[in-house]
Amino acid sequence: SRIPQVYGVADSSTISPEEASDYYCQRKAYIEEATVLSYGPAAAETALKLDDGTTEPFQYEFGFGTGSDAASSLPVCLFAVAVVCSVICAPVFASDYSSGADDIQRCALYGRKRLGGTRVLAALTLSAALYAACAAAFVAITLAVFGPDGTSAQLALDALVLGNLTMNGVLLLALVAGLLSVLAMTAFTLWLSAHMRRPVAVLAVSLAVAMSPTFLMVLLRGMPLGDWLRLLLPSGGLGLGTGMIVDIQAGKFLTLGPVAVWTPFAALAIPLLEAPLFSLLALYSYTRHEGR
């Protein structure tokens, strides 16, 4: 139960009926106190605004969020898909550089921008299709065994969950964030491949970036810098022990002066920007390489 957490006690049996009846007001105070302590007044104000639309009382329903470990196994699956996509995309440009095939291709009528654009689009489409297949299989198996879950995320995950979210909504957000992060990692790998001559080197750098969020959360645990660095990476939503579900659960913020951004919003917005950015950079780098 998340009730003892809100009241700051170890056992719910120590909470009187009068105190328990005031749970929702107590939870608001807990959110404000915890957020001010960790991120300052601006973040606390943002947190309370986000929580204004929360449906009360909270609902409990048995399903995948309360009866399985889907919340911990889904990030592992998403990370595995990202690694596979990186392996597939690493040689897209670099293999032709190393073999010399690029010298022939650049002399063809459509061997410059059109060929590069086609390769980028094909790689992104393949990654999206692979992700969709894996995500569909995961969701189908999970829902078939445990069923959907309308439990309020505040009960299933943490009292610091903000907004009107059920576990069904959390799963949907995690899948969307995973897709955006996989596409961002694919585009980043293509950019590396357009820059480097050896596919092995491209893959090594790509895998290092993919694993960086996990290491950052271990080395910089509890430090705002760790969240900044993690979420700015194209793999920010794919680390083991990190990701959208953890961000929703932890009630974290990115703060810059008076501005505070809830980390789940950043986990959606940043890869949405990085995927087209790195795709364009990959195409630009490939075109420049052809002109040398």
Model-based region annotation:
Residues 122-123, 207-211, 275:
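Residue-level recognition of pore/gate-forming positions within transmembrane alpha-helices
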Residues 16-96, 117-196, 236-265:
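Secretory targeting signals
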Residues 199-236:
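Transmembrane helix segments
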Residues 106-112:
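Short helix-to-coil transition segments within interhelical loops
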Residues 139-151, 198, 222-226, 283-291:
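Transmembrane helix-loop junctions in multipass membrane proteins, especially transporters and channels
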Residues 99, 107, 191-210, 288-292:
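Cytoplasmic juxtamembrane regions at transmembrane-helix boundaries
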Residues 269-292:
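Junction motif at the cytosolic side of a transmembrane helix
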